[in-house]
């Protein structure tokens, strides 16, 4: 069996996390298994399901509690867990690719970077780190994924983007969960007392991408 180590901040009900889970639930887990390295010290929304499906979850200190401890724990993790031959880091920017850098130093042969966004948010330092790491990402990762052409163009160096040295991985969704049901429609409208009203709903962040 192949075990792939997915690296991300948490496994709550965000876009990246739900994308991973949609794939995980529907793949052949007798051939490939996902494990998770998370920089959080809290139980996540998907924790119980992940463990039930046969995964291992490893937790390291969040960066907000000290980047030094975060790096030390990453070094310790990869020095102990030599069994992983594939690591797959999910990112919104290149501001934090330390896990991939340390994986490379520990000779992990397949190191995937997977972009899920088209801009850097938060502190201006993140913008600087994104631009800085963009200069070396081709030396750090071995495989380059993005959720769209725009994400690839923004995430990877111009020369790499123009050469087409990346793969577009479209976000998978479980379409059965969104199939129209008259029964469900009427049930929810009755519960919310909105039988004869036009309802427009939005469950995402009110941001440019949405």
Language model segments and positions:
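Membrane-interface segments of envelope glycosyltransferases acting on lipid-linked substrates or membrane lipids
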Residues: 1-210
């Amino acid at each position: 069996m192949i075990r792939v180590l997915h690296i991300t901040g948490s496994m709550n009900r965000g876009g990246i996390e739900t994308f991973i889970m949609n794939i995980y639930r529907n793949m052949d887990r007798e051939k490939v298994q996902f494990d998770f390295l998370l920089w959080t010290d809290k139980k996540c929304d998907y924790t119980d399901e992940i463990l039930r499906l046969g995964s291992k979850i490893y937790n390291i200190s969040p960066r907000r509690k000290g980047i030094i401890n975060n790096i030390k724990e990453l070094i310790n993790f990869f020095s102990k867990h030599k069994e992983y031959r594939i690591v797959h880091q999910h990112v919104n920017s290149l501001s934090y690719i330390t896990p991939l850098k340390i994986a490379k130093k520990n000779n992990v042969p397949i190191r995937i970077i997977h972009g899920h966004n088209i801009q850097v948010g938060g502190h201006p330092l993140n913008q600087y780190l994104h631009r800085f790491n963009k200069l070396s990402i081709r030396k750090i990762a071995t495989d380059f994924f993005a959720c769209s052409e725009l994400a690839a163009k923004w995430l990877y160096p111009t020369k790499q983007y123009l050469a087409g040295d990346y793969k577009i991985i479209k976000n998978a969704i479980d379409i059965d969960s969104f199939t129209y049901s008259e029964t469900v429609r009427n049930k929810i409208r009755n519960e919310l007392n909105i039988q004869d009203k036009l309802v427009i709903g939005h469950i995402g962040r009110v941001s440019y991408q949405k």
